[in-house]
Every structure is written in structure tokens, then in C-alpha cells.
Amino acid sequence: SVDTRAPGKADDLEKSVNYGELCHFIQEFMEEHTYKLLEAVLENLAEAILQKWEKIEEITLEVKKPWAPIGLPLETVSVEITRGWHTAYIALGSNMGEKETYLRNAVKELDESAGCRVEKVSDFIATAPYGVTEQDEFLNGALKLRTLLTPEELLELLHEIEAKAERVRTLRWGPRTLDLDILFYDNL
């Protein structure tokens, strides 16, 4: 989906998506890439389009394969998907070592991850530990993220970033180099 009101009111192509460019992009993408599954074509094409055209919030694509080798008298087989950007809010925390460095590196890594765009980052604030109180204070913050990832994929990415920061999960509410939590994901 694209916001058509502003370009429609202004009659200004710069405020819209140039559908000619989009069609040529799709043609070139299909000519340059080979996939075994229709699903793979659609997943990769949708991500490429959404990454390239920021004005496109959501896209529905369908690929049809005529004369698919299924052994039945069908003219065509098709697969359709809808993919789009999601908004997530992530909490960041650290209470070991170079706390601010861990947090800034996590923000950078998220922003550089495929299908992720960090839109806003809060200030970092020092807070007292909860639960296990005999440990160093935490440095905490939050960020707003636009992502193409599902909640499960995003959680997996957060765990990978924590692992790179040598996060060890031994004690609930215990000390950690980096703690990343999904606070909100769209309206879930």
C-alpha cells in the first residue's frame, strides 16, 4: 500500500511511486535471479521492493507459473503473498563492562541488519537493578524499529546480537552485557 492522498492532491510524481520504474525493477529482478520455488521468488522480490521504495508500506505480489509440472490438466499454478513494514519497540539494557558501547553497538547492528531500520533511539538512563539487587546499575534505553521481520525472526536476531555481546543467561534478573527485549510489535 502507498499513501496516494498527497501525490493525488498535488498531482506530483515525486510524492508517489514511479510505477514505470517499479515495473522495470521487477523485470530486471526476475531476469537476474533464479529460484526453485515460487515462494522464494516472492519473498525475495517483496523484500527488494520494500527496501528500495520507502513509500511502499505493504505489497501484495502474485507469481503464476503456466504449465507447472504437476501431472494434472491445470493451465497455471500461482502463489500470492503480502509483505510489509512493521513497527517494533525494543528495550536495551546493560550493566556489565562498557555499557554504553554495548548499547550503541546493538543499535548499529540492528540498523545494519537486513529488513531493519532504526527510526528513533531514546537517551540512555541509569537505573537500579531489579530482582537481584547486589549488582551494578543498568544503563537502559529504547528504540523504534521498522522491520520486515516477523516477531519470531526479530527475537532470533535480538538473541544473535546479544550472543555477539557475549550475553550469558545464568541468573534471572542477573548481570548482563546486553539485554534486548521486544516491548511492542505492531498491535500484538
What are the functions of these language-model segments?
Residues E31, K36, E57, W67-A68, ...:
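Core catalytic alpha/beta fold that binds nucleotide/phospho-ligands
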Residues S1-A88:
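N-terminal, polar/charged subdomain of small-to-medium soluble alpha/beta proteins
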